[in-house]
């Protein structure tokens, strides 16, 4: 089996993985950002040395939990996406030198959106308003979008992330192994699950949501890809009000699919990424 292990932060994933009106108008704006008109970092601005020290002080046993997925042939991939890994000759190099060195290289072809573990940067999602595509902090797509990379809102602007992580086990709160595809997680669900765990959210935290949907990975890929449980708009807005840095889930979308409103396309992505960074 061809498997590629990619190094990922344990808290920036969307496989373990954000409501605007149907026709937004010019008065429906979310900019400038609270961090200034030129800000491209978004909610990561909530992270400072105090938050890092707070997170490090929580370590007691030094255990490491790997949340990323293996990139491998046959994994569930969002329709239209692609992933392949090949070894161009075995060995790719050598033998070389008197010591007869041999080696392998990998050739990877892929789209990173909805392929394995991923992180949605702020240039991923925007909203069209009166013919103008606007992203986080009101940046206009026509001024930074190119076929060879984004001139603004790249993930490199976010910077390193070391902070306190909170796992909200919604599946355990509801007494099931796995929430159903299309099951909406409400703000009350999150609050009640946190109360059950005796856990609270602090500004600058990362929130991980366990639905059990990840159990389907490489077991029933068709069901995994068919949709998923996830947060609805109420939960998304509540999380934003808690001033978190980011959220993640063991689903491919984080938000509920099919969505609460069949006429809306990924509104939770718009709420969290575009409006709240």
Label each PLM-derived region with a short phrase.
Residues 1-4:
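N-terminal secretory signal peptides that target proteins for export/translocation
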Residues 7-18:
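Bacterial N-terminal signal peptides
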């Amino acid at each position: 089996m061809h498997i590629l292990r990619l190094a990922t932060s344990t808290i920036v994933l969307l496989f373990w993985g954000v409501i605007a009106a149907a026709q937004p108008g010019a008065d429906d704006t979310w900019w400038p950002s609270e961090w200034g008109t030129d800000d491209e970092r978004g909610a990561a601005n909530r992270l400072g040395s105090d938050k890092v020290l707070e997170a490090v002080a929580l370590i007691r046993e030094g255990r490491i939990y790997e949340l990323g997925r293996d990139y491998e042939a046959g994994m569930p991939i969002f329709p239209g996406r692609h992933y392949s890994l090949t070894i161009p000759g075995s060995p790719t190099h050598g033998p070389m030198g008197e010591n007869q060195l041999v080696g392998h290289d990998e050739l990877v072809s892929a789209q990173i959106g909805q392929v394995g573990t991923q992180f949605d940067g702020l240039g991923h999602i925007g909203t069209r308003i009166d013919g103008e595509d606007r992203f986080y902090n009101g940046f206009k797509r026509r001024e930074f979008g190119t076929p060879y990379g984004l001139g603004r809102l790249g993930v490199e602007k976010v910077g390193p992330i070391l902070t306190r992580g909170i796992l909200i086990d919604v599946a355990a709160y509801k007494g099931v192994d796995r929430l159903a595809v299309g099951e909406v997680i409400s703000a009350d669900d999150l609050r009640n699950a946190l109360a059950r765990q005796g856990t609270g959210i602090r500004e600058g935290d990362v929130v991980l949501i366990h639905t059990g949907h990840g159990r389907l990975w490489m077991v029933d890929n068709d069901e995994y890809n068919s949709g998923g449980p996830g947060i609805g708009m109420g939960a998304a807005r509540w999380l934003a009000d808690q001033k978190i840095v980011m959220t993640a889930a063991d689903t491919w979308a984080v938000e509920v699919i099919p969505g609460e409103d069949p006429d809306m396309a990924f509104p939770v992505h718009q709420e969290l990424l575009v409006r709240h960074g």
